[in-house]
Amino acid sequence: QMCIRDSRYSDDYTSAYYYPDLSSSIKNATLAITAVENQLEAATTTAHEKEFFPNVKQFARIWRAYLISEFVDNFGPYPIESFLGENPVFNSEKDDYEFILKELKEAAAAINTSVLPVEAEGKCDPFDNVKYDPVKWQKYANSLRMRLAMRLSNIDKATAQAEFEDAAKGNKILTADDMFAVKENDGWDVFSGVYTRSFDDQVLSSTVANLLTNLGGIKVTEQRSDLASYVKPANYLGIKYDRHYVANTDNPTKQYWLDGMPENLDPRALKIFCLPDDENAENYIDKYNDRTAKDFVLYTVDENGNPIPNKDNPGEIKIDATRCWNGYPAGSRGGWSPTLAYNQLVTNGYGPGCTLPMLGKDYCKGKSRIFFAAWETYFLLAEASLYGWNTGTTAKEAYENGIKASFEYFGVSEYVNDYLNSTNYNRVGTSVKFDHTTEPVSYTHLT
């Protein structure tokens, strides 16, 4: 996960995704398919509509195939004959995937790419950068088919390979212009941005903090020279607070607080996340104007977790989180762990949002959200090439093109060549260079 909605545990989102979200969306997509068939028989249908509406049917089939894949992957068997006026029978997941892949193949082939929508029709596309462009929808169908075929690679490799190779022959999402993005609005309508709620901090997780640190070997000061005074040596882990953070986690940086910035960061990191109180950053947002990164403390406790000198008047360890790079420790909540009870950085309602990096302005106040990106297609091609499948490219070429596409999107292409040749390991032992296969060794960080 890239970030987490800190300190809150609920299955309400999962329940709502099952019903009404997915169920209603599949129903509406099915209705669109049948409505086209009825509309084509209407006497009022124009010559243009008789050409355009069949494409709409294919767009709806593609969209429904995606929705059904979401249902199957999240909840299990799905009834293929749903929303057709009769009580359906649930199909097996194998049958569901066969249906999904067949729908995508047939729909992509049936799109008439010479038929373009008029302006009013294009505005109806929820992917506002696509506007019912038939070629782009065809590319989405093929890239989506590649994604879903790859999911079968561990259970039905023959089917996965056949479906993938066939889809890879067609048009695919490979450029920034091809990518699908959903428009986002402020407010409370169906297009409200998923990260726009002021009560959602969307802070950096410890997992992603470890992944991005040192990956690519690009110095933070190359991007932001004004952060030089906050940068710590690459082998410095931070200050250990083993009385304030839990130990029962596999996080390699558990119980450490980095009082500054790591020397090297993936150059996309500071485009995605903004640092606490980093008002110089282009993507900075201040959700809590009356609080700062210096307003939260750790209360002093003894080796048994008892406050010092007493519960009513514990001492304080002042923390200045200004422009510091730390991730929220997954599984943390003060009510579940007495270790965290005296840690305001975690348990105070405003603590995480003020002391940890969070998704920046482009996410919280953006106008669109990427739904299917070019780099995913490239990484799918890279994985398939490693399996020896026919892809028309090599694993290395596709892998590097995927990274280049991502760097282009985030506006950091000037770093991509050095990044691609980096053999630096991040905190979980991963390096960027494709040909760098030397396994990392354990070493001790300075603290």
Q: What annotation goes with each model-predicted range?
A:
Residues 350-351, 369-378, 386-389, 404-410, ...:
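C-terminal functional modules
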Residues 2-7, 444-447:
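Conserved small/polar residues in nucleotide/adenosyl-binding loops
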Residues 5-380, 384-401, 405:
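Structured, solvent-exposed acidic/aromatic patches
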